[in-house]
From Swiss-Prot:
Name recorded for this polypeptide: Potassium-transporting ATPase potassium-binding subunit
HAMAP family on file: KdpA
Main subcellular location: membrane
Organism listed in the record: Ralstonia nicotianae (strain ATCC BAA-1114 / GMI1000) (Ralstonia solanacearum)
Keywords noted in UniProt: Cell inner membrane, Cell membrane, Ion transport, Membrane, Potassium, Potassium transport, Transmembrane, Transmembrane helix, Transport
Amino acid sequence: MNAFLLQLAIYLAVLLVLARPLGTYMARVFGDAPSRAHWLRSVERLLYRVAGVDPRAEMGWKHYALAVIAVNVLGALAVYALQRLQPWLPLNPQGFGAVTPDSSFNTAVSFVTNTNWQGYSGESTMSYLTQMLGLAVQNFLSAATGIAVVIALIRGFARHSARTIGNFWVDFTRGTLYVLLPLSVIVAVFFVSQGAIQNFDAYKEVTTVAATTYDNPKTDAQGNPIKDAQGNPVTEKATTQKQTLPMGPIASQEAIKMLGTNGGGPFNANSAHPYENPTPLANFVQMLSIFLIPAALCFTFGAMVGDRRQGWAVLASMTILFVVLAVFEMWAELHANPMLAHLGVDQAVGNMEGKETRFGVVASSLFVTITTAASCGAVNAMHDSLTALGGFVPMFLIQLGEVVFGGVGSGLYGMLVYAILAVFIAGLMIGRTPEYLGKKIEVFEMKMTSIAILVTPLLVLVGTAVAVLASGGRAGIFNPGTHGFSEVLYAFSSAANNNGSAFAGLSANTPFYNVALGIVMWLGRFWIIVPVLAMAGTFAAKKRLPVTVGTLPTHGPLFVVLLIGSVLLVGALTYIPALALGPIAEHLAR
């Protein structure tokens, strides 16, 4: 535990050192002086001319929301088309065929919504062109969308008596050009230095040092599996010394995968694969990359509203929630897995099932907490192999709404929605009209807040109920009982909150889950974005109220406690009954 606390302290210290200047820089990027890099400003102006965009023309919230939805619909159509046309497109050295319609739909929605849920195995499904032009591009654009939306909300708080909240195309372009691209280049070069691969070679077949013996299913002349009288597959022993090593442009996709809190990797093993995450140092940088922009945006928020203490208060709330749950996760994983203990397995170092030996329990547990606190979903250990309580932590973090740092942009605007709820509750307690940052919280804002908070629980709980009742949903559950229910609950929690990680024991690459989770991902993204932009518009139009003796300070310890309490209260009331049927019941049964 001491090693974990030391690594956690170092991680948070380095994160703070990097996030503060980045946050200040982003405040300039989305202000009047985007950058001193004149060549980037020239590129920016060129992009506006090519696209026919007037960067000086600002938008109301409805126009802004339509632009957000339009660009994401076009992105989803492009990714879908790339997958379906894959056999006839270049950069496909393995000759992969077209992806099925339901899987193409799921993947297109997944990457456009910043979820990166993957029901397929990347190294055996997607060509290099599909990975680069489709998935990696959406890693940039989905992150830029989140940044643009939160910047619009911040402008709503910062402006008064205004009808506009900015220009989406400008925010979208600047987020990509000035923030995501430069950081991705730096991180990608670092990953290459650590051993992550970056090439366009065909897959390599190599001879292993030792032969591998495995059970190979027997088939008849038509290729159908042969089964015995009990219906079990008939197998025969086979031995091989050949292994296929996947190749590809990995480091470049890995960088934006982490920085954009996307999470979807080129390989099925994700960041547990040595070609994606080769060393403990690379692993540390991956964890830093996940939280870097979400943490920096808190400083951007403080700078743009003219009170840096506001950003510190939000960051403190996020950090306290994160540290408490990270320590609990580590405690759970340092304990032996009861199922393995019954088999006499040595677990002196904790639960190592599903973890890479080069990372161990400490780095794996920290990664688990970070990737689910943010809406990243990348994994360096298998979440389905966590202990019952170890699996409870990432699921609960996701169900809190991805507001503990959260996704790029989405984490902060989600936490600001809870901040509005917190001041509303405080206003009810003292009998005053609530206000936040000098803006009065009225009926419309509370309606939008309620929608933004209630959408994801509705999608999660209804989706889970439908899945366990429908035959198509039950067919994907291979682990019966409480753990099987946990797998389904985790899948819909991950999809609705745009995380993308999974309890991978669930067989989710089926028409039922591909369509159901695709719908949930889309609604979970845009049914929150639209209410947030609506609030941005109404806040921008309001007059700023003067601070009085009765105004609740939203930059001190009391507000931090109120904000944390609001997040936990909503999460507990909404999900504890479902969690009691899953990971909690599983833990008590052992």
